[in-house]
Amino acid sequence: RLFGVRCIVTCGSDAKVAAALDLGAAAAINYRTADFAAEVRKLTGGRGADVILDMVGGDYLPRNLSCLSDDGRHVSIATHRGVTAELNLLEVMRRRLVLTGSTLRPRSLEF
């Protein structure tokens, strides 16, 4: 919030939703009881999220991309649901999406 970022999070339980809101999330969605992609679209007035930090991977990738704004950035940092996903590359190109990732491990200065 300090930088003007509105953080929308997804959680697997109502208790985690409450905790995320207590920690300062602008909105929290229980992905077990709601269609998180539709909720993100609704919360952003149909625009979608500018950045998605994905710790799930696998079959969640297409759903994450569906709630990403045009020119949005998807950042993968874990693969709890698997390391492979099917996606429509034409959609990625048409909407000018950026897909990137990190293992969050340190690198040498020479890298």
Predicted segments — roles?
Residues 2-63:
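Adenosine-nucleotide cofactor-binding segment
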